[in-house]
């Protein structure tokens, strides 16, 4: 059909109906990002990082929704030593203390402003997370396990507090392509910002602000992967990713789309296809 003007108008109308029912508070978003940055300072990380949890099993793939997290997970999980666990809620639940009644009134990141609210439980949080992960894996031969919940970008400091040896991969994509793809996706209420383009741009700017902070703190412990680079130079970028995960190269990582594992993601049909270029600079079709 290629009637892009009509298409974007239809998306606007449909999303406006959803947006009218879901309030997105920009002030709350900004305050949350401010608090995360202020609480999880370099000094804070160095003081509380748990050196007694040496596990190198965990790989976290995170970033904005629709930025390529599923593609990267599929490449890595095609490796014989890797289990892709999908999008898991455990980090968010533990960070907010949802499993502990006494902390139910203290949410993330405010819970971490007072060490009495988190320090006694940090080691337990790490154990709980690993136990949950290992129940999913149930295979002693697996060396690495992937959690690809995109929203874990908010919890990178918490992740490194528990697991200093974790591998964190942040996916990037053309910002306009990312935002349009989010706008076109029929997300649930967990993405209230996604139904209005102005709110979406605001949210994305706050996301970038936080990620730039995390990179300044954990630069040598994170890998930034650009979606467009993966599409245009798949083999070289895939080898770089596998090396970052401390794994030996396997050619099957380039044939990830042949895997029969179940994948629950907004990109579900795409993981059954070879890498394609049609999503690159897709926003050009919609003008300004």
Regions found by a protein language model. Give the residues of each.
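Short beta-strand-centered segment that lines the nucleotide-binding/catalytic pocket of NTP-utilizing
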Residues: 83-95
């Amino acid at each position: 059909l290629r009637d892009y003007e009509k298409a974007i108008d239809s998306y606007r109308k449909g999303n406006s109906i959803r947006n009218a029912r879901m309030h997105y508070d920009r002030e709350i978003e900004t305050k949350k990002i401010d608090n995360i940055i202020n609480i999880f300072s370099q000094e804070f990380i160095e003081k509380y990082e748990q050196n007694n949890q040496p596990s190198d099993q965990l790989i976290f793939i995170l970033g904005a929704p629709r930025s390529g997290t599923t593609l990267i997970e599929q490449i890595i999980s095609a490796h014989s030593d890797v289990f892709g666990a999908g999008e898991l809620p455990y980090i968010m639940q533990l960070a907010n203390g949802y499993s502990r009644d006494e902390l139910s009134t203290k949410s993330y990141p405010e819970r971490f402003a007072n060490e009495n609210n988190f320090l006694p439980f940090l080691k337990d949080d790490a154990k709980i997370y690993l136990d949950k992960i290992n129940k999913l894996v149930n295979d002693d031969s697996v060396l690495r396990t992937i959690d690809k919940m995109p929203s874990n970008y908010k919890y990178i400091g918490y992740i490194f507090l528990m697991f200093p040896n974790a591998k964190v991969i942040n996916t990037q994509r053309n910002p306009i392509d990312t935002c349009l793809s989010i706008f076109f996706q029929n997300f649930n209420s967990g993405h209230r910002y996604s139904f209005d383009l102005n709110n979406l741009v605001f949210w994305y700017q706050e996301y970038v602000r936080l990620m730039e902070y995390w990179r300044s703190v954990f630069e040598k412990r994170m890998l930034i992967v650009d979606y467009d680079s993966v599409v245009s130079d798949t083999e070289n970028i895939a080898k770089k990713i596998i090396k970052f995960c401390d794994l030996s190269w396997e050619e099957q990582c380039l044939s990830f789309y042949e895997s029969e594992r179940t994948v629950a993601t907004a990109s579900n049909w795409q993981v059954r296809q070879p890498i394609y270029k049609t999503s690159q600079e897709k926003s050009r079709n919609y003008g300004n």
